[in-house]
Each structure stands twice: as C-alpha cells, then as structure tokens.
Amino acid sequence: MQKKPWFIVGLVVCLSPLAGGCGGGSGAGGGMDATQIPPGPNGNPDGHCAVPSAGLAAVTASPTTVVGTGNAASCTASAVVAAIAGGGVVTFNCGPDPVTITVPEIQIFNDGGLGDGSVTIDGGGLITLSGGGANRILYQNTCDESLHFTSSRCDLQNTPHLVVQNIAFADGSTPGDATALGGGAIYVSGGTFNAFNIRVTNSTQSTSHGDWAGGAIYTVEQSQPVFVVNSTFDGNVASSGGALGSIGTSWSIYNSVFTNNATLTAGDGHAGGAIYNDGNSYTLSICGSDFEDNVAASLGSGSIFEVVDDLKGALVIDQSTFTGNSNTGSVQSSSHPSIYVEATDKAGNGGLTITATTFN
C-alpha cells in the first residue's frame, strides 16, 4: 500500500470552514539516504485559527525545476542543491514513498528566482532534507557577498523571498563560523521567509551565547512578518529559543506544535525553551498552537522569551495550550510561568495579551 502524503492533513485543518480568527558553507556534494521514514502529520489538529492570505501555501503547479525522475535514487543531494540555487519553484518527483535526502548546506542566492528573488521549496509531503548532524540545511543571507549582492544596503532589502512548504528538515547543525549564532536547520538574514506545513526535528544551534538562538530556525531583520503555519517543531536545541530564534523579526504562528525543544544548560543565554525573540518594534502573534514539554535553563521561560528593546512591541496569544513547559531560572511571568515578555513601557509584563488559552 502506498503511504499517503502527510501534507493533506495540514491543508484540511487550515481551510476548515469552522476556523476562527486570530490577531495578529556550502557545496554540491553529499549523499542520499533513501530511508522510508514518513515525516508524519504536521501542525496542531486542534488548531482552527483562520490564516491570512499572506501565510497560505504558495502555488507550485508549474514548477521551475523538478528534482528526480520518479524514483528515490534520482533524488540526489547535488540535484537538490542545483535546483534551489536556480531559484523559482522547486518540487520533487522521487517516487510514491517518503525519502530522506542528506544534503550539505544549501545556499539561497539573492538574485535567484524568476527575476523577483523568489525561491519556493515544496516537498509534496514526502521529502525530508537532512543535515546528517553535520551541517545546517538552508542558508539565506543578503549581506553575504558570495550569495551575490543585489543592493547597496544589503541589510534593508526585502528579497529573496524564501518559502518552504510540505517538507521536513532533520538533524541540522550550525557550522563553526560567523553564522553559528543561530539556525540549526534554517538561517535567514534579510529578505523574507514563510513556512507552511513543515516539520523540523533534532536540529541544533550548539554554541552558548546570550543572543544566539534557534535550534530549528533563526531569522534576522525581516522586512515582513514571518508566517509559520501548520508546522511542528520537536526535539530541537539552542543556546536560547530551542525551536525558533530571531533578532528584529515579527512572527505570525498559526496552528502549530512545539514539543520537547530545549535550551543548552551551560554558559550564557538559555531563555525560551521553544521561542526566543529580541530586537526593536516587532510583534509575536500565536494562534491555535500547542506548546508542550519545552525546557529552558538559566534565564528560564520554558516556552517563550521576548524582549523588545525599544519597548514598542507585543506578544499576542489566542486559542493555544501550554502544557508541561518548565525552566530552572527565575525570569518568567508570575501569572504564566512559561512565558516572559518585555515589550512596552508598561509596568510588569507589558505588551502581553492572552485570550482563550490554557496553561497546565
């Protein structure tokens, strides 16, 4: 019997008519591991928050490049690297069964895409890209000259537009260079980024430092809010923000799951077992999501740690659940021990709005 693509489950949840509202190093080498391990269903099956159009999956019916010719052996790491380097819409034809492809760090070029810097990677619910525990999986940086400068102010540009959807990432690890500050699986500095129906597991940002974060994903200076929709983050580890970390990024997280993510236990940082945010003038909006058994050490905040340096931000949580998140530090909200937010100049945990949400 053929295994069914898991992305169908997430799509049904997203488009449910019962939905409610919510605010808010490189190289082409590497081998292929054709293990038949299905990524599994993604997102929160109990999350029914309506997703704005900006957060919906990209249209991939007419791909720029298709990786593979219908069987697992044709889906090599070098083919994946070349397809993504070319930009545009990348899909996969690796046969009817789930396939894991172990890849080197894949670069997102600033001038890729169809003249607009767009890169969409759609795994069709059957593909896992793995770093093999040796390297990060995706790398986007508008200020990395090797990725081709496209403007005189690389820190302010809003391209490339990177979208990952219906795909899993596993066993990513930060490199020992200047980008080791975050993103065990995915690093995005500049441009824009969205994730729809993805799963990130067992990925690590392994260097201990106060602002270094994001075992799964790390973003820097995003000109538009990052949408994370119908996605699952499990077993990721970082200095702070076991799953997600960022500087200067607004997030819109819908119908997603964060489980068993953790911070490192020695050195600096260690805030936000699941999410760590820092920077100026941004908002973290969460709706229909589940946070369970995430752990933080040192500074604490078992699930979410947010500091907006200019005190012009907010943390908005709606229709979500927090269960079994823990920390060994003292920095946390008195009313919601797994959360800490300092987002406005109001006394206490200013900028925090929570509705229809349970804490256990």
Regions found by a protein language model. Name each.
Residues 32-78:
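Right-handed parallel beta-helix/beta-solenoid
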Residues 65-70, 85-103, 118-125:
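Glycine-rich repeat segments that build the extracellular carbohydrate-interaction surface of secreted
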Residues 123-125, 160-173, 192-206, 223-239, ...:
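Right-handed parallel beta-helix
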Residues 1-9:
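Bacterial N-terminal signal peptides that target proteins for export
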Residues 15-39:
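Bacterial Sec-dependent N-terminal signal peptides
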Residues 11-13:
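Hydrophobic helical h-region of N-terminal Sec-dependent signal peptides
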Residues 131-135, 173-179, 204-213, 237-244, ...:
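Short glycine/acidic-rich loop motifs that flank beta-strands on beta-rich extracellular proteins
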Residues 81, 85-86, 102-120, 128-165, ...:
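Extracellular beta-strand-rich solenoid/capping regions of secreted or surface-exposed proteins
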